[in-house]
Amino acid sequence: QLTFTPGW
């Protein structure tokens, strides 16, 4: 599962 990560 891909989750939004600030900085990625």
From Swiss-Prot:
GO terms classed as biological process: flight behavior; neuropeptide signaling pathway
Secreted among keywords: yes
InterPro entries associated with the record: Adipokinetic_hormone_CS (IPR002047)
MF terms (GO), sorted A to Z: hormone activity
PROSITE patterns: AKH
Post-translational modification Pyrrolidone carboxylic acid, affected residues: 1
Residue ranges crossing the lipid bilayer per the database entry: none
Protein localization: Secreted
GO cellular component: extracellular region
Top-rank lineage group of the source organism: Eukaryota
Main location: secreted
Keywords (A to Z) from UniProt: Amidation, Flight, Hormone, Neuropeptide, Pyrrolidone carboxylic acid, Secreted
Residues with Tryptophan amide modification: 8
Family the entry assigns: Belongs to the AKH/HRTH/RPCH family.
Role according to the record: This hormone, released from cells in the corpora cardiaca, causes release of diglycerides from the fat body and stimulation of muscles to use these diglycerides as an energy source during energy-demanding processes.
Protein name (database record): Adipokinetic hormone
